[in-house]
């Protein structure tokens, strides 16, 4: 196991690719897509192209999308949950590849980031090569599906920002949007937790006709959002608005299960 040679040991249990949620598999697909382009650009000494590719990955795909969505899993799920373990596994894969890809461009920064975990000056990031991409990571159909999900999500997040500007909500977790899509749009979200993807406390995906005053984004014809606020109280642990929370210091069912499980393991 390469991770053991890099000082990671058994810090966490890895989640196998076939048991990961679709969002985690999409991140690995993006790494596979980028890897082939970076190898080609490295051969051609196109380091500006590599920088542009990685800037888009870090800014758009990771920071503004994946990390934003998965913070709740990392902070609030049970430590040994499959979803949280899958997230940590993917974040490790991102780290290992980013440090290698950035090494020729940001030599000192890449080394500092690498040594923060390896803590072995003789094991330099500059002695590494690009890790091979495992079979199965590249999945064009999955990539196309998540491109569609992100387009619908853009309408929802824009609607939430408008509601925030109007003073209807202070944070997205106060919302429970009803998202009107066509049949193809509904299929995109099959099996997914739409509220988690939108960072709201609740959400509905429906193929019903959207009301005339539903929020729309010009150029995106397959989605419209009817704004609604979430019912219930604010969970003191995860901050979601849930119907089972009835007191100021109450917590939701998910958090109650996690806390009780943690107490058992003490």
Regions found by a protein language model. Give the residues of each.
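Short, small-residue-biased leader/transition segments that mark boundaries at the very start
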Residues: 1-12, 266
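Acidic, turn-prone loop/beta-hairpin segments
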Residues: 13-40, 67-159, 163-183, 206, ...
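Short helix-adjacent coil turns
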Residues: 42-49
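TRNA-recognition modules of translation machinery and tRNA-sensing kinases, especially anticodon-binding
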Residues: 62
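A glycine-rich helix N-cap at a beta->alpha junction
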Residues: 197-199, 203
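Short cysteine-rich clusters marking metal-coordination/redox-active sites
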Residues: 235, 252-255
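Cys/His-coordinated zinc-binding microdomains
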Residues: 239-242, 256
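Short functional micro-motifs and their immediate structural scaffolds
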Residues: 243-246, 260
